[in-house]
A protein has these predicted regions:
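Cleavable N-terminal signal peptides of Sec/SRP-targeted secreted and luminal proteins
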Residues: 3-20
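Catalytic-domain carbohydrate-binding cleft regions of carbohydrate-active enzymes
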Residues: 18-361
Length: 361
């Protein structure tokens, strides 16, 4: 045999030795009362105009400014959800969703209607955008919310249950009672509060509260509200967009870098850290961030594996969830919550303070 043939044989034997074994990942977990439940909430945060215009964001042009294409997100979510009925996704910004909806065939629209009615795809917040809560007049907040909700009601015959103002800089009591409780939301979640307030709330487990925003309406217009422990991002090392560098969960023992034990350990420890600052045995992880899920399979493939192996390990229980499922789970515990009145204003961010200090002092 010549060198070429020998080499070829080695490659062939090498390929045959990498056993490929089909694994059916068990993603069917539901809430387990006696354990820490990690609610994995798959989401994207799509600013309706920020570094690019709303049109550029939708079609994915001018990607040198920011690599962001919202129609890719919505296009890729549909097959990813159809591939496993346990997977879930939330979508927020109606300015993008309605644009995409108008571009779809009747067949796709019917599939999406089924995903919404089965609860796999949940439309939350439901306004055209995630409005700022400090500068706009409340009439405009009502109008832009109404416009989005009307469409959702007409097309899907559902009403969004959850307020999801994860990126506005600080939060107003008006948002809590008028654009939250009075809209009919069951809960309201957000990412940005003053960094000192957040630190204190982590210490005394008061990130989640009952928020009574109106003095005159009192408890008749209160709402369950939660600030996230960090931002609206996943825990460290759990980012799975195509170019993200979080370590993948490599579960084929015949390949290099098998790491199931290590990655499960990291997952469990992040869950316990968050449980330590949270009332009840339910914690929510926001699995996504700005303009993510442009290729949704990369996220779901990893989350499928985590759910499978973390639950096999058994120290905590991981599940595909939504903020509605999380809210119902919190409610079912009968926990009593700290009371919050007035605003989450003024807002200061520690990162920004540091940058100001470095560049302007
Ligand atoms: C966006 O892309 C278009 C087409 O390539 C180009 O003409 C325009 O200058 C770009 N805009 C910005 C702000 O870079
Ligand atoms: C849990 O919280 C307590 C008090 O807030 C803190 O002292 C402790 O280090 C935390 N433990 C873990 C594992 O995060
Ligand atoms: C919560 O309270 C309801 C009504 O009193 C009761 O049926 C239920 O068992 C309680 N749940 C827990 C987890 O204590």
């Amino acid at each position: 045999m010549g060198a070429v043939q020998t080499c070829f044989l080695f490659v062939l034997v090498g390929l045959l030795c990498v056993e490929s074994k089909y694994i059916k990942y068990d993603t069917s977990s539901v809430i387990v009362p006696g354990k820490i439940n990690v609610h994995l909430v798959a989401h994207t945060h799509d600013d309706v105009g920020w570094l690019k215009t709303v049109d550029q964001y939708y079609v994915g042009s001018n990607n040198s400014i920011q690599g962001a294409c919202v129609q890719n997100v919505l296009d890729s979510i549909v097959p990813a959800l159809l591939a496993d009925k346990n997977r879930k996704f939330i979508y927020v910004e109606q300015a993008f969703f309605q644009r995409w909806w108008r571009d779809q065939s009747e067949e796709v629209q019917n599939v999406v209607k089924q995903l919404v009615s089965s609860g796999q795809l949940e439309l939350i917040n439901g306004g055209m955008c995630m409005h700022d809560e400090a500068a706009p007049h409340y009439i405009d907040m009502i109008d832009q919310t109404t416009l989005g909700h009307q469409f959702i009601k007409e097309e899907f015959n559902v009403t969004p249950r959850i307020g999801w103002q994860i990126d506005p800089f600080g939060h107003s009591a008006v948002q809590a009672y008028l654009l939250g409780a009075e809209v009919g939301f069951d809960s309201f979640f957000f990412g940005r509060i003053d960094y000192q307030d957040r630190a204190k709330r982590k210490g005394d487990k008061s990130l989640e509260v009952v928020w009574r925003g109106s003095k005159s309406l009192g408890s008749s217009a209160q709402i369950f509200a939660g600030a996230f422990p960090q931002n609206y991002e996943p825990p460290i090392n759990l980012y799975y967009e195509v170019n993200d560098d979080s370590p993948i969960l490599q579960d084929n023992p015949s390949l290099f870098d098998y790491n199931v034990g290590e990655r499960v350990k990291e997952f469990v420890s992040a869950a316990m850290d968050q449980a330590n600052i949270t009332r009840t045995n339910h914690v929510m992880w926001t699995m996504g961030t700005d303009f993510k899920y442009q290729y949704a399979h990369t996220w779901y493939k990893q989350m499928d594996k985590f759910i499978h192996y973390v639950n096999q390990d058994g120290r905590v229980n991981a599940l595909y969830s939504t903020p509605s499922i999380y809210t119902d789970a919190k409610y079912a515990t009968n926990e009593s919550w700290p009371l919050k009145t007035d605003d989450f204003f003024p807002y200061a961010d520690i990162v920004k303070c540091l940058l100001d200090w470095i560049f302007y002092e």
